């Protein structure tokens, strides 16, 4: 292990710039939490494991701040009332967009300086959840509730201005009758 980062180039300079920033954030987290030596984590000498959502989410947040793709994902989850708890973000691709959203919330509510404090507290306590609680003064359950409220206040007002699909359209398929989950290449007959 040589404390290196890999930066792939896929042909787009904009994407390349994003990847550089993203990977450098991982290097900074590694330095801050593990003193630049993640070998202790691999060998089992260091017990602290930064949650995937916190690591990937912060890398996304600091490399692109907030973007339309992230906004679209989080808007859909909030409107459909399918927001996961913060610990549940670890188990899906939402570690990136959901984690990015959590960091957006934290920086807006508590300030950007809390980001470094959270990681310092993680290192001090050797526990991610206690690090967040020590820095923010709330546990993950309360942080989850507050984050959900933040997203609902942001996105639910959009629903007021939308028409109900049933008011201007006619349903042409009925899933309860066809027992299918999605329609591919629908055609009128």
Where do the model's predicted regions map?
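Beta-strand-rich domains and repeat architectures in extracellular enzymes and scaffolds
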Residues: 170-189
